[in-house]
Amino acid sequence: MIQEQSILNVADNSGARLAMCIKVLGGSRRRYAGIGDIIKISIKEAIPRGKVKKGEVFKAVIIRTKKGVKRSDGSIIRFDTNACVVLNNNDQPIGTRIFGPVTRELRNDKFMKIISLAPEVL
């Protein structure tokens, strides 16, 4: 569960390392976001010569959370870190590589690009 002020790792090669959630998108009173949800982020730490700079604001999709996601068969998939992938205004990833596993819950028309770039789909 990600809320405003949550710090996330960035799991792509856009140049960002850490990001902070500044808004959960999808409703005026929505408080929490989980895996597959889109949030607004501010870049808090970035590498030199990356595609994004510190302080810039982007959309991002959450791909891993410590809270995890519950499947219909009763299993729960949890991760050690909270992680996101930076998106442009057309909801396409800025980076060309994804680091670490992603869950099957991202498999819809919007995020098939992320699924295809990921090294492992759980």
From Swiss-Prot:
Molecular functions per Gene Ontology: large ribosomal subunit rRNA binding; structural constituent of ribosome
A Gene Ontology cellular-component term: cytosolic large ribosomal subunit
This protein's UniProt keywords: Ribonucleoprotein, Ribosomal protein, RNA-binding, rRNA-binding
Annotated InterPro entries: Ribosomal_uL14, Ribosomal_uL14_bac-type, Ribosomal_uL14_CS, Ribosomal_uL14_sf
Pfam families, sorted: Ribosomal_L14
Domain of life: Bacteria
GO annotation, biological process: translation
Similarity annotation: Belongs to the universal ribosomal protein uL14 family.
PANTHER family linked to this entry: 50S/60S RIBOSOMAL PROTEIN L14/L23, LARGE RIBOSOMAL SUBUNIT PROTEIN UL14M
Role summary: Binds to 23S rRNA. Forms part of two intersubunit bridges in the 70S ribosome.
Protein name: Large ribosomal subunit protein uL14
Organism: Buchnera aphidicola subsp. Baizongia pistaciae (strain Bp)
Gene this chain is encoded by: rplN
